[in-house]
Amino acid sequence: MKRLVGVLMILGLMLTSWGLLGSPQTAIAASLSPLSFNPSPVLAEQQFRNAMDDKLATDFGKKIDLNNTNVRAFMQYPGMYPTLARMILKNAPFESVEDVLKMPGLTDTQKEILKNNFSNFVVSPPLDALVEGGDRFNNGIYR
């Protein structure tokens, strides 16, 4: 009985594999006649622009944008990192550079540091690419 079951299983396996592998699959090629291939004319070429390229062409690349820059950019100015930088990020957006002096909880020393660095600051509208998520606080660059 075991031998009969074994023979039937082998026979069934051979018939199944012959059925799957034995019949060739026909390929259907696409017709590339001139009537079916109609290229559409290009009416106008659109140039794609990255919003960050436009932003870097402004003062953003040279100065600290108070509404868009991350906390690590403040490290280059003494007295700004980390306390003042964190306060600026938490209280942004600002309408003008002078608005940073209106932040609550500033000491006189911190106000002097901010006033001395006004020439290093610029204010522009916040861009979603720069302010979404936690990238302003931790942009993932560790040196």
UniProtKB/Swiss-Prot annotation:
One record GO biological process: photosystem II stabilization
Record keywords: Electron transport, Membrane, Photosynthesis, Photosystem II, Signal, Thylakoid, Transport
Primary localisation category: membrane
SUPFAM superfamilies reported for this sequence: PsbU/PolX domain-like
Disulfide bonds: none
Database matches in InterPro entries: PSII_PsbU
Compartment(s) of residence: Cellular thylakoid membrane
Source organism superkingdom: Bacteria
Membrane topology recorded in Swiss-Prot or TrEMBL: Peripheral membrane protein
Positions annotated as propeptide: 30-44
GO cellular component, one term: extrinsic component of membrane
Span of the signal peptide: 1-29
Claim: Transcription regulation is one of the keywords in the record: no
Subunit structure: PSII is composed of 1 copy each of membrane proteins PsbA, PsbB, PsbC, PsbD, PsbE, PsbF, PsbH, PsbI, PsbJ, PsbK, PsbL, PsbM, PsbT, PsbX, PsbY, PsbZ, Psb30/Ycf12, peripheral proteins PsbO, CyanoQ (PsbQ), PsbU, PsbV and a large number of cofactors. It forms dimeric complexes.
Entry similarity comment: Belongs to the PsbU family.
HAMAP family per record: PSII_PsbU
Record's function text: One of the extrinsic, lumenal subunits of photosystem II (PSII). PSII is a light-driven water plastoquinone oxidoreductase, using light energy to abstract electrons from H(2)O, generating a proton gradient subsequently used for ATP formation. The extrinsic proteins stabilize the structure of photosystem II oxygen-evolving complex (OEC), the ion environment of oxygen evolution and protect the OEC against heat-induced inactivation.
This protein's name: Photosystem II extrinsic protein U
